[in-house]
Amino acid sequence: MLFDSRTPQSSEGFKPNVDNSIKKPIPTGVEKFFFILFFILTIGIFYFVYVGRKNELMRDQNEIQNASSLIQAAEKRRRAVLIKMMDSLIGYKNFENETLSKITQYRSKLSNIDVDKTSPVELKSQIDSIRGALNFQFEQYPDLKASKLYLQFSTEISMQEDEIYATIRNYNMIATSFNSKIYTFWTNCVAQKLDLYNVAIFQASEIERVDVDTSELRN
């Protein structure tokens, strides 16, 4: 049996980690031999195939850049919606001074985030943190949460989050395809010539991977 389903399972379970360490494609001596042999046997015709694969890898890198940019654009949009939400709700008459002060503080933090210079992972982590803190403040005002304006913003933010996850999945798909391609023969020979290496896939921050503790809600 290749796999035995009767094997005892670890009580701790298993959570896979993302390995984004750089790994350059290194063709074996045999692969290099056949690569050169193809050139000789095809009397240089293989060169045009080589150029085609080289251009393909260049296009792939541009697609990865574009996919990464789409993640940042989606996060930028969610940030803008959150700021607009706080600006619209900050005049809520029943807010206590402490709550109002915290909301103003969160808005300032959002405004100070440099979307263009912050990595997608860090950007998502910062905005998630602020949104979580904001939701905690709004929990104290059930009548506000039931208002049409609040529900409208919440729906829009949820839509933006769905778009973010979609752009992340798209990025990972393109990056994984590129990573698989540069390690297969004979593309690995081309990749080595171009000094290419694996592209990092999206990795959740340590805080985002922590299980949500709901024990306090039962007390």
Curated annotation (Swiss-Prot):
The chain crosses the membrane at residues 32-52. It is found in: Cell membrane. Its main location: membrane. GO terms for cellular component: plasma membrane. InterPro entries: LemA-like_dom_sf, MamQ_LemA. Keywords: Cell membrane, Coiled coil, Membrane, Transmembrane, Transmembrane helix. Residues 54-82 form a coiled coil. The keyword Transmembrane helix applies. It is a single-pass membrane protein. The keyword Transcription regulation does not apply. Belongs to the LemA family. This is Protein LemA. It comes from Metamycoplasma hominis (strain ATCC 23114 / DSM 25592 / NBRC 14850 / NCTC 10111 / PG21). The gene is lemA.
